[in-house]
């Protein structure tokens, strides 16, 4: 699959779309888990990276957009994990 993608021209938008969808999902799950209150650094950083990814994509800078989307995905997952841990430690159930 990778060899096929390398051979294609203009695959940046496709790769960005895949990463962006994953990042958006991770951030949305973190929000649902209460990450804005329980893991604010990771949550708001993920939002910022996702916004920057969208901005870079809009300008046609897909390599940068992909990197920002991947970072947003990572931080969104961290925010989700921390929010769940904080909820469990606080006696709440998800």
Report the location of each language-model feature.
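Sec-dependent signal peptide recognition
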Residues: 1-2
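Amphipathic, heptad-repeat alpha-helical segments
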Residues: 12-43, 47-50, 90-91
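Short, charge-rich amphipathic alpha-helical segments embedded
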Residues: 63, 73-91
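C-terminal motif of bacterial Sec signal peptides marking the signal peptidase cleavage site
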Residues: 6-10
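Helix-capping and short linker residues that terminate individual alpha-solenoid repeat units
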Residues: 31, 35, 58, 77-78, ...
């Amino acid at each position: 699959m990778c060899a096929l993608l390398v051979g294609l021209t203009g695959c940046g938008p496709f790769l960005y779309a895949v990463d962006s969808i994953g990042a958006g999902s991770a951030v949305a799950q973190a929000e649902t888990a209460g990450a804005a209150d329980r893991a604010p650094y990771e949550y708001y950083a993920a939002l910022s990276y996702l916004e920057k990814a969208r901005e870079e994509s809009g300008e046609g800078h897909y390599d940068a957009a992909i990197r920002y989307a991947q970072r947003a995905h990572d931080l969104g997952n961290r925010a989700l994990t921390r929010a769940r841990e904080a909820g469990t430690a606080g006696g709440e159930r998800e």
